[in-house]
Amino acid sequence: MRLWPQAWGAVRGAWRECFPLQGHDVARWFPGHMAKGLKKMQSSLKSVDCVIEVHDARIPFSGRNPLFQELLGLKPHLLVLNKMDLADLTEQQKIVQRLEEKGLSNVLFTNCVKDENIKQIVPKVMELIRCSYRYHRAETPEYCIMVVGVPNVGKSSLINSLRRQHLRTGKAARVGGEPGITRAVTSRIQVCERPLVFLLDTPGVLAPRIESVETGLKLALCGTVLDHLVGEETMADYLLYTLNRHGLFGYVQHYALASACDQIEWVLKNVAIKLRKTRKVKVLTGTGNVNVIQPDYAMAARDFLRTFRSGLLGQVMLDRDIIPAC
């Protein structure tokens, strides 16, 4: 929920202009070697007619693996920005324009939960294939599409959504809220009868080197790595910083806080109190150990992240500062 800036005029000057990035080692957050997955994708390319790259619509410019275009660049390519229901797309046209400037002219926004825009995928893919040379597959009556992307952006959900739309059937690919559900290039999964289209689901593959700590934090907020590798409280702090800077104060209403605040300790303390999340801590006193009840900051941080990821804090564009001003 976006409130009028005047509502928080008294505290507006307190928002941080930058997030402290020193002391964070992004290399420790992400798996350092995913070449095995890329090699398996390459070995399957001969039987592939088109590549669908799935990415999170909340970070259209951040965290995409550049190796996808380098290794799979000879094939027609469609970028699907999924989870559009969670993203603030008021600047969608500018986002598409910037992506086009980067050479990505085929972009589609989707919501696999409600099958939004899913029906556009097969016609778009068929158009791309018709405009390209199929080499030794020219006489093959069926089409094979490879689905790639970083972890937990909805690749398997996209496959299941396509099957619902075109085959009226159930799940064929496992899905989950954590990265790493798909661990290998799967066998072909049929998603359409006419035309006859099969998809290959692939494991999420991150770039060998994350470009910056801030990009790493954005990827972490979108669930591309396990939270404990980055630290829930660090992620919650970056989320709070982002929400306040963008004037998104839905967290105030959701947790019934007295006001917006830029201090993560204060926010998590009040969230823990609201949720009745506490823990016992032993404190050494002059008369011995005493059990003291304290707010559970870790549990509060996890809930803060969960509500963001489920959309309860409103639609958010984490790449807002990268969108062209005009």
Curated annotation (Swiss-Prot):
Membrane topology: Peripheral membrane protein
Subcellular location: Mitochondrion inner membrane
Single GO MF descriptor: GTPase activity
Pfam family of the protein (one): MMR_HSR1
GO cellular component, one term: mitochondrial matrix
Domain (CP-type G): residue spans on this chain: 35-208
InterPro entries given in the database record: G_CP_dom, GTP-bd, GTP-bd_ortho_bundle_sf, GTPase_MTG1, P-loop_NTPase
One of the protein's GO biological processes: regulation of respiratory system process
Sorted UniProt keywords: GTP-binding, Membrane, Mitochondrion, Mitochondrion inner membrane, Nucleotide-binding, Transit peptide, Translation regulation
Binding site for GTP: N82, K83, M84, D85, N152, V153, G154, K155, S156, S157, G204
Residues in the signal sequence: none
Record text on subunit structure and interactions: Associates with the mitochondrial ribosome large subunit; the association occurs in a GTP-dependent manner.
Function: Plays a role in the regulation of the mitochondrial ribosome assembly and of translational activity. Displays mitochondrial GTPase activity.
PANTHER family, per database record: MITOCHONDRIAL RIBOSOME-ASSOCIATED GTPASE 1
Similarity annotation: Belongs to the TRAFAC class YlqF/YawG GTPase family. MTG1 subfamily.
Name the record gives this protein: Mitochondrial ribosome-associated GTPase 1
Gene: Mtg1
